[in-house]
From Swiss-Prot:
Residues 408-445, 518-537, 555-576, 658-744 are annotated as: Disordered. Residues 1-26 form the signal peptide. Glycans are attached at residues 71, 77, 253, 318, 344. One of its GO terms (cellular component) is plasmodesma. It is found in: Secreted, Cell wall. One of its GO terms (molecular function) is structural constituent of cell wall. Expressed in root hair cells (at protein level). Disruption phenotype: Irregular root hair development that frequently abort, swell, or branch. Stronger phenotype when associated with LRX2 disruption; frequent rupture of root hairs soon after their initiation. This is Leucine-rich repeat extensin-like protein 1. The keyword Signal applies. Residues 382-744 are annotated as: Contains the Ser-Pro(4) repeats. It holds the Pfam family LRR_1.
Amino acid sequence: MLFPPLRSLFLFTLLLSSVCFLQIKADHDDESDLGSDIKVDKRLKFENPKLRQAYIALQSWKKAIFSDPFNFTANWNGSDVCSYNGIYCAPSPSYPKTRVVAGIDLNHADMAGYLASELGLLSDLALFHINSNRFCGEVPLTFNRMKLLYELDLSNNRFVGKFPKVVLSLPSLKFLDLRYNEFEGKIPSKLFDRELDAIFLNHNRFRFGIPKNMGNSPVSALVLADNNLGGCIPGSIGQMGKTLNELILSNDNLTGCLPPQIGNLKKVTVFDITSNRLQGPLPSSVGNMKSLEELHVANNAFTGVIPPSICQLSNLENFTYSSNYFSGRPPICAASLLADIVVNGTMNCITGLARQRSDKQCSSLLARPVDCSKFGCYNIFSPPPPTFKMSPEVRTLPPPIYVYSSPPPPPSSKMSPTVRAYSPPPPPSSKMSPSVRAYSPPPPPYSKMSPSVRAYPPPPPPSPSPPPPYVYSSPPPPYVYSSPPPPPYVYSSPPPPPYVYSSPPPPYVYSSPPPPYVYSSPPPPPPSPPPPCPESSPPPPVVYYAPVTQSPPPPSPVYYPPVTQSPPPPSPVYYPPVTNSPPPPSPVYYPPVTYSPPPPSPVYYPQVTPSPPPPSPLYYPPVTPSPPPPSPVYYPPVTPSPPPPSPVYYPPVTPSPPPPSPVYYPSETQSPPPPTEYYYSPSQSPPPTKACKEGHPPQATPSYEPPPEYSYSSSPPPPSPTSYFPPMPSVSYDASPPPPPSYY
């Protein structure tokens, strides 16, 4: 019989052995549950079981990538997964002595493929950034194992299907960027019951209205623009006053009246509802939005008199109410008294102002007052929002910068940690730089809009030292929000210091200047032959998270995703050359949206074209944008349109030769560009297939340029790394891909 001490020791040893056995068995069960067919070489030695699982996940994903033009995954071999390009490791939050894969940043890699289900093995992942690639299919359900995932950026790819509900099961998620994809159907109401800080769903195919519990969300930035939502703006919007800084609902086919509850949004700096079908008067409660800097209500059917309280807002910088049916404005709103405010009130029914509607239009049904109670919209309030534990820090997003100007600069070649902007991803620089995000789709400069430009101070210059390590923890730093020069709409958050993998994310600094946010529909993207999955330019990387111990991933989020690199296409827009992409025959300035032959007037029949000139060849004048529509409106028709073309040279879909330098293009016969307005909007162009299979020839679908970037980053990318990544176009969210073409 064993003595009591020996028996206790024996039982303890047995228990410890059982726990270790169960852990090892669980690891192998995870692998078998995911159906991985990766055979791990027995000669490979791994630092710990977590990195062994990461090896299986990344090797499975590598097999699911059909095209890697910059050989970004070339060094994804061997057991040292922490040295793989785009992979960042950090100490586990649960076991600090154990290194795990904490971040993935493949922004602007121009890869084509799909997301392997084995990625669910990366259960310690805190950030996943793959914007501005050509990944297609659907988001695997196995992502529900990523309990620490804080930032998810899938923008500017070719994902399809309904809203990926797996994101609703991620308990730590704070930043969600699904812009510029082909998601469709309803926006789930549960999304607004989650404790998210930023939601970007613009430029998809969502329909069936905005959920009535919208006001339950504690987000600081909400962008649902360029879908086909329809319906009313919920009255519950008034419940978002404590956190909301920016709301963009433009070009969503919204109807009804503007709910008076918007007066509760006292922290909102940017409010944009242009290009919808809203009616009735502007509520006088708008005068309570004390922080308002940008108010855009153009291209609707508003009537009545402009409330005087709007023109008394002390922070107002841009008030655009053109293309409505307003019948009057108070004397205080006269342009002479608003010298410091950009005001555009053309195409209304205001007596005494220039460029107003005709008497016939001003006596039409649309110009008559409406009874807003008949719409039955904003009287419905959703139940009180769930109580969220807000981090002590004050979150304030800098107002987006509407820059009606040229697209952002081309991405740099080196890969830097994800830079997040509400716009296209920033250019990668060093292996590990703080993630910077910018949120503003840099559309080409457009003529018809008052130049309200808002820029946030660019992030500080990169420090020579490597980025701080990922730290999994600590509450998110307070949002720092400053508005410097007017260039782009940039929300940049400082790079996460140590990657802190824990609940609160690192402080969000919404400040790096992203590409200009332009309200305009992007020109039809030039079709390009993508790999097995539809090809599209990569969006900006978006990243803001809790400090982490290893070097933080790339820069932070951006409103509109940007660009990728690829061969020069015959697109009608001139984009700055992108690093690593072959230079086009010669830069050609195409008219923004017009692909069809212009009017008979200036017709030049090119004699250089290989094929006989069509009946009326087009002479594309230099940079001259197509004539603005009758009324200065930010956005094109109500139909949402796909992401604007990114500043990338896309190879033409057809084998036709590249256009000669002096571009006198013959009509459609010679160049592949689609006819006018052949821009596929979310509601019009057929969504890509739900799955992309290797071996299938790429389909010539119009490539969507990366959306503009809102950079959530506040710190510049880290210094160039000692080890260089394969050439890869990267655009910091501040320099997101080319903005979508302006709708003017």
